[in-house]
Amino acid sequence: MPQTIASPPTPEYDLEEVAARLDEGGVDLGDPASVDRCAALLGGLARNRDFLADRLVADLKAAHAGQLAANRYSAQVVLLHRSRRGHFLRANIWPSASDEAYRTSGARAFSYGVPHDHNFHFLTAGYWGPGYVSDYYDYDAEAVDGRRGEPLNLRFVERSSLGEGRMLLYRAHRDVHSQLPPERLSVSLNIMDEGEHVPWRDQYLVDLGTDAARWGTIASRPTLTPTEALLRCAVHLTDNARDIADHMAVSHPVPRVRASAIAALAAVADGTGRTAALERGLRDADARVRDDCERWLTL
């Protein structure tokens, strides 16, 4: 499960100071020294009981006046700061099952009941409320190919909540959690270590359903870069895109992108051409590509 981080005895910080100090020192949550420094800053921000309310009110006023240049909101996320150095700071809002947002949008809009790992490290602190509840597991990424349906050999650790003052370090490709809504509306603060490499790494959604044969296996890999999405569209419009897809299917260093290129080529081919495109993927060096193509051949 995520590593519990003792919140350092730091003073209260405001958002601007935390953002500036993160930008100055950078964020590398794979480095213990960086984790300690970020934990001190996040802990100091979490002690500031006014900054988030002030920020939300200011943004609402700006939006009402037509002055908000960029919408920072999704169903649950408030983007507080994005750095050019590849990290960002955000607040996540977690509605309870009785809140109108939950009833309107449903559980999946807030990732409740969607077991998953992460393809990046992030540091999180409970800011307000009892916090979301998680069943925590861990797994050994080195023992996993990443094929759909592959067992992760999960190890259950505990069920606990991210209450006020609790701080956790979620580790990429190691920690899995299945979240449940809090007893009442809650807020967490996150420092996200999302560098340029992250979009090329797979995230796993995990099957923790009632089918014993599938329990603890990889249900899907939802990560998709803009390049992959664009390629799948462009091959329908121009032969030049098909040439690019043909090249990427062989030479791209990321297995998922090679598989996406093969899928794009197969989508614009008929009959034996589709089969030939997918059979080409059966010779790929990576098990994920071979498995994807084998599955697509049966469809």
Regions found by a protein language model. Give the residues of each.
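Ligand-binding loop in jelly-roll beta-barrel domains
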Residues: G163-E164, A172-M192
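A short, N-terminal "cap"/entry segment at the start of jelly-roll beta-barrel domains
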Residues: P8-S98
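A short hydrophobic beta-strand segment most commonly corresponding to one strand
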Residues: T124, Y136, E183-W200
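Conserved short histidine dyad/triad with adjacent acidic residue
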Residues: L60-H64, A91-H118, R171-H173
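Amphipathic alpha-helical scaffolding segments comprising HEAT/armadillo-like alpha-solenoid repeats
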Residues: D239-A249, G271-G281
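Short acidic-glycine-tyrosine-enriched beta hairpin
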Residues: H118, T124, D140-A172
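Conserved hydrophobic register position within alpha-solenoid helical repeats
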Residues: C38, P226-C233, R258-A264, D292-E294
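Charged, amphipathic alpha-helical linkers/stalks
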Residues: G195-N240
